[in-house]
């Protein structure tokens, strides 16, 4: 009898799909209490509108009651079991999703702004209002969702991407084309998808979620007024796709690469505008548009940044404006493509002082211009230079020199050959499986050169290993201060949690690495409500054993040293009862 052919193992990419670590696309294996808290800021928009005599309009105080009745958006049984509505732990208007595939519970609190707006009525003042709410609640939540009308959502997403400086958490704008209260609507799926993105992944960007795709907020534009697939990101693929599984394109995710804390910049310059070139445009129209108080414009040109070079009158007005220090940023009218000085008609604009805007959308260009011109500490030349730089991933920058790819690595090739795989997907699966433990091993040794080599080959230094521990977790545990600094400057997130729920800050506290704690705190790391759950008892235990170093570590991390333990006593009372004089002296100094 002929032997049955040996079954070829399923592809490695499929085999590893359920085990890929958090930094490479999947959240880490859940801890015993895997929870996330998301703040939903409701600004208005179609998603929460109702029909009245004049048409669709936002209605206040209706959304929460409606969501409570939707099983996909609120687990009523779990809420009753945990007495969610009567808990002092959660604010009013808090709902909870059913448990996710990753066995994670996402609690979300709805904060309704007043008045609720149709997005056509949005102004920079409203952008500032949203940004201030993000800043006010930043340390209380793991991620943020902003409900917004679709008409100006791309403008708000772009503006917030610049206003949110040193962002380290996920911010997702979403809305719908049809109110969520109607039988057939896109609001339920969009809200659920946005909550899953904000609650399960650390994507430190202002994003926009619509029709199963997560986009970079400053790369999108609304392309369809009547379709659920209303938005497009013409020059950048989606950051994530939500299909049977959620797939994150981590190589595309923008990272701040900074050691500075999150802050918002709300004083945007409103003396900006959009001017679209068209055949026969008059010099008088251009001159009128460029008059004071205008300080900057986005010039929407033909093709790859072209304008008529036989119109001396128009060019003269642009030149005069540039000489008056009006900043002019050149963007293409095309949906896809970039401004390039390939044609003489494009070079002519550069010659009169117009700045090439690359492949920015008009929405991104306008809000970037508004943001840059508001930086009063910068000179005119510095502002022009800033507009040419890629600040938040809003434009494509072609890297100089060839970059080594992990696919070209002999190490990866040998492993791939031994596993008989050759497809791009399988090679990526090999990379995603091997890079995290290699990077973590280098972090344990404090080997910056090894990590730099991994990064230069395209490795993601925010990847977690099989336990969800990132190189920053390891470096913080070992107290390798220069390595922690390098990882932070390479975009490593201080908010990553391993399967046990620990952050790099918690690891640094545990091993008493004071300098690392200070650096992480400077970067914006903080203790969440989850981290502080049993802190009172831990602090009392440290006080009872005379562990001043441990108490100091918690103090630097932001813990309240007056928290009580399980028996109602605080660390000071415990130290008095146990006669720990050094602890008493320390605690009295800090009170």
What is each residue range found by the language model?
Residues 431-439, 464-470, 497-503, 530-541, ...:
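Ankyrin-repeat boundary/"N-cap" motif
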Residues 34-35, 41, 63-81, 91-102, ...:
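Accessory alpha-helical/coil subdomains and C-terminal extensions
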Residues 450, 482-483, 515-516, 549-550, ...:
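Conserved ankyrin/ankyrin-like repeat signature
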Residues 3, 7-136:
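ATP/NTP phosphate-donor binding region
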């Amino acid at each position: 009898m002929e032997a049955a052919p040996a079954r070829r193992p399923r592809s490695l990419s499929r085999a590893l799909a359920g085990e890929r670590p958090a930094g490479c696309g999947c959240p880490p294996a859940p801890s015993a209490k895997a929870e996330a808290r998301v703040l939903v800021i409701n600004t208005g928009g179609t998603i929460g509108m109702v029909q009245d005599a004049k048409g669709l309009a936002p209605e206040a105080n209706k959304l929460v009651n409606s969501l409570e009745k939707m099983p996909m958006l609120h687990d009523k049984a779990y809420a009753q079991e945990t007495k969610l509505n009567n808990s002092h732990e959660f604010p009013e208007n808090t709902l909870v999703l059913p448990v996710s595939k990753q066995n994670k519970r996402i609690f979300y609190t709805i904060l309704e702004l007043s008045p609720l707006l149709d997005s056509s009525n949005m102004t920079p003042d409203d952008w500032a209002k949203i940004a201030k709410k993000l800043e006010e609640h930043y340390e209380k939540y793991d991620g943020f969702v902003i409900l917004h009308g679709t008409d100006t959502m791309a403008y708000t997403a772009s503006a917030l991407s610049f206003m949110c400086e040193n962002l380290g958490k996920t911010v997702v704008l979403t809305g719908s084309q049809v109110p969520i209260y109607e039988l057939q609507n896109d609001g339920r799926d969009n809200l659920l998808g946005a909550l899953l993105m904000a609650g399960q992944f650390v994507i430190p960007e202002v994003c926009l979620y619509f029709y199963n795709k997560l986009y970079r907020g400053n790369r999108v534009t609304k392309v369809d007024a009547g379709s659920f697939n209303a938005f497009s990101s013409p020059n950048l693929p989606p950051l994530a796709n939500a299909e049977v599984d959620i797939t994150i394109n981590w190589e595309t995710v923008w990272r701040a690469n900074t050691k500075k804390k999150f802050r918002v910049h709300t004083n945007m310059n409103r003396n900006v505008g959009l001017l679209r070139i068209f055949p026969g445009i008059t010099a008088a129209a251009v001159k009128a548009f460029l008059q004071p108080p205008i300080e900057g414009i986005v010039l929407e040109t033909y093709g790859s940044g072209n304008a008529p070079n036989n119109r001396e009158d128009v060019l003269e007005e642009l030149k005069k404006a540039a000489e008056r220090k009006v900043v002019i940023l050149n963007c293409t009218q095309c949906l896809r493509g970039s401004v390039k000085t390939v044609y003489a008609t494009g070079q002519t604009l550069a010659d009169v002082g117009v700045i090439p805007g690359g492949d920015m959308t008009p929405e991104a260009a306008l809000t970037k211009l508004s943001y840059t011109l508001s930086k009063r500490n910068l000179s005119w030349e510095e502002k022009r230079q800033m507009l040419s730089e890629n600040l938040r991933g809003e434009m494509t920058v072609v890297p100089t020199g060839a970059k080594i790819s992990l696919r070209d690595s002999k190490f990866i090739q040998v492993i791939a050959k031994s596993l008989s795989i050759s497809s791009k997907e399988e090679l990526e699966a090999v990379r995603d499986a091997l890079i995290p433990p290699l990077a973590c091993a280098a972090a344990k040794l404090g080997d910056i050169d090894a990590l730099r080599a991994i990064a230069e080959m395209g490795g993601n230094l925010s990847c977690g290993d099989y336990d969800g521990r990132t190189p920053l977790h390891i470096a913080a545990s070992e107290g390798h201060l220069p390595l922690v600094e390098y990882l932070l400057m390479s975009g490593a997130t201080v908010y990553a949690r391993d399967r046990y729920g620990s952050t790099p800050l918690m690891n640094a506290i545990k091993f008493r690495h004071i300098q690392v704690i200070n650096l992480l705190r400077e970067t914006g790391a903080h203790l969440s409500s989850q981290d502080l759950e049993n802190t009172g008892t831990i602090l009392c235990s440290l006080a009872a054993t005379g562990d001043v170093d441990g108490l100091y570590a918690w103090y630097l991390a932001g813990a309240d040293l007056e928290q009580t333990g399980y028996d109602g006593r605080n660390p000071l009372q415990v130290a008095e009862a146990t006669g720990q004089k050094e602890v008493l002296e320390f605690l009295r100094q800090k009170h």
